[in-house]
Design a protein with these regions (language model features):
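P-loop NTPase catalytic phosphate-binding loop
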Residues: 1-54, 64-136, 149, 175-178
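Conserved P-loop NTPase
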Residues: 136-179
Length: 179
C-alpha cells in the first residue's frame, strides 16, 4: 500500500486513483489518514510481536519484509508540515511509528524552504538513515558532507548511523576515472 502526499505543484496528481495508492490531498483525506494509518501500523507491530512468540530470533527487518509493503511518499515535507499545522504531533507520531514498523518513507525537501522547527520537520532532521540525492550542501536534513564524499553524477549519498557512503544509483554505470 502506498500513501502519497503531493506538493502544491501537483506533479504526482496523475497517480490519484492508481490501484494500491491512497492520494492524500484534502483536509478530510488527511484527517482520515491520521485516523486510520496509525491503526494499520499498530496491527503490523502486533503481528510482529505475535510472530516473535513462535520465532524468538525473528528480526523486525525480516518480518516486515515478509508482509505487505507499505510506503509513504511525501513530496515536500514543508508543505506537509503546513497542512498538518493543527495535527503536527499526530503526524510526527505516524512517521515515527511507520519507520519503526518497516514502512518505507520517501520524502523530498526543498532546501531553501526547510527552516521549520515543527514536529514533522524535527522527525526528518533527526533521522539516522536515508539517501541524499542532489546537492549535499543545500540539504538541511543531513549534516554537512566532507569533500571526499561528494557524489558525482549517477551517485547518491547513503546516510547510515551518522556516516555517509557514496552509492551508485540504479541505471548508471561508473566510468574508470570516477571509480
Amino acid at each position: 500500500r502506498i500513501y502519497l502526499f503531493d506538493s502544491s505543484s501537483r506533479e504526482l496528481f496523475y497517480h490519484r486513483g492508481d490501484e494500491g495508492l491512497s492520494y492524500v490531498d484534502t483536509g478530510e483525506e488527511l484527517e482520515d489518514f491520521l485516523d486510520e494509518f496509525p491503526e494499520k501500523l499498530l496491527q503490523r507491530k502486533s503481528a510482529y510481536h505475535k510472530a516473535l512468540e513462535s520465532n524468538p530470533r525473528l528480526s523486525p527487518k525480516e518480518f516486515y519484509e515478509s508482509i505487505e509493503l507499505m510506503v509513504l511518499i511525501i513530496d515536500d515535507t514543508d508543505e506537509l508540515a503546513e497542512r498538518c499545522s493543527g495535527t503536527q504531533k499526530a503526524m510526527a507520531g505516524c512517521l515515527a511509528l511507520a519507520a519503526e514498523t518497516g514502512c518505507g518513507i520517501i520524502a523530498t525537501v526543498q532546501s531553501m524552504k526547510s527552516k521549520g522547527y515543527d514536529e514533522v520537520t524535527k522527525f526528518f532532521k533527526t533521522t539516522t538513515e536515508g539517501i541524499l540525492l542532489g546537492n549535499p550542501g543545500s540539504s538541511s536534513v543531513f549534516p554537512a558532507v566532507s569533500a571526499r564524499n561528494l557524489p558525482v553524477m549517477g551517485e547518491g549519498l547513503l546516510y547510515h548511523g551518522g556516516e555517509f557512503e557514496r552509492v551508485l544509483l540504479p541505471g548508471f554505470e561508473m566510468t574508470q576515472e570516477e571509480g
